Amino acid sequence: MPDTATGHPTSHGNVSPFVEIARADWAALAPATHLPLRETELVQLRGIGDRLDMHEVEDVYLPLSRLLNLYVTGTKKLHRDTSAFLGERAKSTPFIIGVAGSVAVGKSTVARLLREMLARWDDTPRVELVTTDGFLHPNAELQRRGLMERKGFPESYDRRALLRFVTQVKSGVPEVRAPFYSHLAYDIVPGAEVVVRQPDVLIIEGLNVLQPAASGAKLAVSDLFDFSIYVDARTHDIAQWYEERFLSLQRGAFSNPRSYFHRYAELSPAEAVARARGIWSAINEPNLEQNIRPTRSRATLVLRKDADHSVANVLLRKL
C-alpha cells in the first residue's frame, strides 16, 4: 500500500486525505504577496546545514504564510460568529500552530521563519515560538528513570506539563511560563523560564507535537492546534543532514568547555563521523521510524524536502 501522505490511491482504491501540490504550482498561489525580509535576517534564521535563501522563501514560505493568514482570519471570524450565536462576548484566543519533524530535518528553521513572516501580517503582530525541548524531563530525572539514551522519545517529555501550558495559552491566561532548555548544557536550566503573554499566534515546535494522547489521557497537545505542519524528507537524506550538522557542531559549539558534548571536540574526523552515525542509528532513526513519522498523517500540511533541503512539493489536507 503506498504511503498515505503521497496523494496517490491506495491498493483499496481509497484516496489520500491530502492534495499534493508541485512546488511550481504552490509558488504561483500567492503572486501578489510581499513580506519584507532581508538576507541578513535569513542568515540569523537559518539552521546549521539549512540552505534557506530568498528564492525558497518566495516560492514556499510566502504562500504558506498567506495560507496561514487566511486560516487565522477565518478562525477569528468563526469564533466571533459562534460567540454571537451563543449570545456571548467574543474573547480573543491565540491561533496555535504545531511544527513537527525529525531531528536535523529543518523544522526549527521553518518555525523561526514562520514566526518572523506571520508577525509581518497586520492582524498577527504578536507571534511567539516555544519549543518542546523545555518540556523534556531534566537530565537527573531521565537518569533516574533510565531514559537518557531515549532523550527525545515521547516518554522523555513531561507531556502533562506541555498540555497544561498550551491549554492555558489557548484559554487566554494573561501570562504563561514554560521551562527553559539550554542546548549548550543539554538540560533544563533551573529557575529560567520562557514567558508567553497572550500572543496572536503561538508556534509549538518539536519532534513529537503531533503524537496522539498518552495512554489514559483524554486530550493530546495536537488537539489544541488550529494548524499543524510536518517537515518531511527521505530517511537517508535526514541521516546525511544529521551527520553534517554533528560535524559542524563538533568544529564549533562542542569546542566550548561548557558544552555537554565537549568530549567530542577532540575526535578525529573519522571518529566524529562514526559517532554521528552511531547516535543516528541508535537513537534518532528509531525515534523517527517508531514515533515521529507515524504522526505525519495527522498534520494539516506536509512540506516534503529533496536532498538539497529545498521543498519539492506540498501536501495540504483537504477541507
Swiss-Prot record:
Coiled coil: none
GO molecular function: ATP binding; pantothenate kinase activity
Subcellular localization, as worded in the UniProt entry: Cytoplasm
Example GO biological process: coenzyme A biosynthetic process
Any one GO CC term of the record: cytoplasm
Similarity annotation: Belongs to the prokaryotic pantothenate kinase family.
Protein name: Pantothenate kinase
Annotated PANTHER family: URIDINE KINASE (PTHR10285)
Chief localisation class: cytoplasm
Keyword Cell wall biogenesis/degradation listed: no
